Amino acid sequence: MKKRLLAVLLAGAMVLSITACGSSKDSSKSTTEAAKKEETTTITLAAAASLEKCYTEKLIPMFEKENKGIKVEGSYDSSGKLQSQIENGMAADVFMSAATQQMNNLVKEKYISKGDVVELLENKVVLIVPKKGNAKVSSFQDITKADTIALGDPKSVPAGAYAQEIFTNLKNWNDVKKKASFGTNVTEVLNWVAKGSAECGIVYATDAASSKDVKVLTEAPADSLKTPVIYPVAALKKSKNKDAADKFVKFLQSE
């Protein structure tokens, strides 16, 4: 199921980047009118920045259409930042991180029940360059041919931690970090490359698919990344709308 879900997210990101603006006015009007007729439960989703487009343009509208009495509000950032926000009192109902570490930390700290965690999605780490222009680089191995490399901060951004692991295993991390600019989340990295502020960058496949201004050169080499890129999701124990939160998590698991 993970591979099918990844395919849906990738396809959705590419299609929606072109078609999402087409019918927003009518659907928004009908949604507003329906909301007036019934009470609405609002849940807060804290999710990795790499999933923002998939959620806002496809998954949340689909869920709200099927569950008229539930509204989902999203908060998107690096998984490390979201973990800290939850620990500091953020009233999140559902958490979806771009790595297992942040989810495991919240399980250990009793914010989430281990049995509620679902490994929902497996992503890929890719090397991107601006769509326009001639790239100096062609692979993870020769990335230091670029003068500016965009990466997520390994301390708080899972995509950055994955990049560090990849380049460490390829024996070129020390050279890479000398040319790296570190973003606060993976979306910032994507935007730097899309705008040409960086010659190349490391993001997830879902991010690359969501932008028409970048192109993927290659996936991370086999065996360079020992840690699977897993996106776990779970409802938080202290959610004030646990039934609605559980319903949303179950929806995400459906095919």
List the model feature ranges, each with a label.
Residues 69, 91-92, 198:
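Short, high-confidence coil segments that cap the C-terminus of an alpha-helix
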Residues 1-24:
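Sec-dependent N-terminal signal peptides of Gram-positive bacterial secreted proteins and lipoproteins
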Residues 74-83, 92-106:
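Ligand-binding clamshell of periplasmic/extracellular solute-binding protein-like
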Residues 116-125:
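Short, glycine-/small- and polar/acidic-enriched structural segments
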Residues 67-73:
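A generic structural motif
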